[in-house]
Amino acid sequence: FKIIELYGFSASGKSYKAKKIVSKNKLNDSFLNISTKNRFFRFFYKIFFIFNIQILDLIFITKIHKFIKFSDLIIKSKSIFSYLYVIGFIRYHIKKNQSIIMDHGLFQCLYGSFLRSPNNMILDIHVAFLFNDYLKNLLKNSVFIIIKVKTNLTIVKKRLFKDKNYQKLKFFNKNRIK
């Protein structure tokens, strides 16, 4: 059983690279196809996977969110929902013994939390230890591969501007990413 997660900045080409990997390997690509569905369908699709969550998962999500400060409740709620969906999706496919590829997994959830927190701060190094301990439990008897998607940041900026994703453009400019 194999889980492949692609990690990188928004508009960096994660989905594109994931589709190339799917065509070469026998992987479940349902995670990649959800973005093509309408918002109503996506919501209920994600709820289906959340039912696979276990108590250990809820404890992990709670602990992670104690260390991350969000500017408002809506952003925090979206972050929690994202973690629930991703973990539920992984648990479901572990039960089915299906190898999967994800262009927005646990590390992307953490990265998103970082981007949405005031001053881009995650308050404690314990987050790394929490992730490490949790992944050992969640992914035992599995192969977990993380692929960092490298990209041309000029192209990413153009895509973000075209998509009117000003929050992430602001992050680029604030941190002088060139």
Label every PLM stretch briefly:
Residues 15:
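Walker A/P-loop
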Residues 38-121:
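ATP-dependent small-molecule kinase phosphotransfer cores
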Residues 6:
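Hydrophobic anchor at the beta1->P-loop junction of P-loop NTPases
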